[in-house]
């Protein structure tokens, strides 16, 4: 049955506050939720705010479903703001009411919807089976979390302290919290010089294990939303981890790492969850839900950060892009590395095409094409990229990438256990796409009908017409279990439509149209063994932003040779400096409230000069080249240093955006290639492409705009 999607209200970017209808001028009260959207509260708690105008704060009274909570009100960061941490909310809807005791102001009411701490909220039914990993989760102070306390893999929340010593090591703080003699101090980005002691909270939300960290000396008052640690710069960095294969059916044994010197030393708070590591859970929807719940927990503990920065490479970039676009307000800016737009399309298209091509070159027609010709057909700059990516393509096979924690007897087998757990990308996204008509396999938005593989190689004379026709005649496709078959793969049209309208295929016109994006890349295209992290994918994201918004000046690309630090948080490296500059960009944009200009205008004019498209020369003393980055293999200094090699679908004539799931077709005879064919070749071409070849000039089949943001499944 197909997934059912409901659109909920779009969130105000940069906050969680849900606005009430505008009231008449005069004294009034306004309620909002600071810790999350009002409709996605979890765990029974919510940090709320009452903004007062023309009313004495001492006259304000607040109740939840008739229960007076006025005694919990605290003064906020401004005289006209009152705040309270509401606890004990039942599951479902509750009505919060704020009114003036002397009837001096218009009252306000806000409905909040609370969900279980174990979820789900908007990601759909929990996946089963689900293997707990708490007993293997290593704590910052050593040891593990131990066994879970329920079937949802929950643990009791705990707080530990570590400190950094003068030798650059993190150690557990003594139980009596006295300051060790070798304690280091750090100076934060705001100039505070504080003991380098870190408060680490570990717990569970949405069945994942989360960690948060923040500079805090336990000899000072316990932090809460109104008592913030001296060393916190009021920024939260949310870290997203990479991976994808084997990322299903497990809780996960590590987050993306919150005891991060490069961040903590500058005063940033850090958060992550095991379900925000794609190697544990390769599902952007569940990642968004987990982040929402963990950030909510953080805000209830420390107050709302001024800004939240998303930070992730590879599988972490998938999350940063899609959370930023589909669930706006969770991040205010993102720094990505080794990026792709998303896993389900840009990546899957490339690696499954590589699988088909490699099988053809090595098994179907061995010896027919030289390695140079294979490179011309695939587009890759290094031949070994082809087998490397072909292996990665097995993530669509339900039998290959099962996590070690998943018992063999629970795994899918077509004969022995047809109802077992299917270990593939599409089965892990069944809440979105639903099951096919048989009920045994997920719907798949995967298609290669009409794709003229090797078209550019043909037009450039690298291969002959007969070579081109044989390749396309025998390349084949995949059945529901990713067995290689002679026929091409046909997409499920319902799944294809869902992919576009829900943002599973990154649109770029949702929340990403309102935040700064920094794309860092330590170049991997020339890796001798091949590498999946191709530079072209960053340009696919940029092209989607251009198509959605008409401009891309909120997107910056930085490229350097690998081996100079890579994607890390050390401020002495390019990526580490980029985080500081992203912070400055977000901060300056927020301070620019000129109503005469669009959000993108304000982002563009507040971009730090350092954050300009650039690459660095190779070698021990790299020099910066300030140059617009382009998707070319030559024609500029950066393109010469770091060529942008195409994917098989680009070689087949596809768009740079890589956003067509299933192409519309045109008769081969109506193309330039068709005009070159002999009568014999034309007869074969009609058999090879019975429905025609892709007409990439038209939108894809079922291609449609984003339905909205904050969708529920």
Annotate each language-model stretch with its function.
Residues 1-10:
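Sec-dependent N-terminal signal peptides
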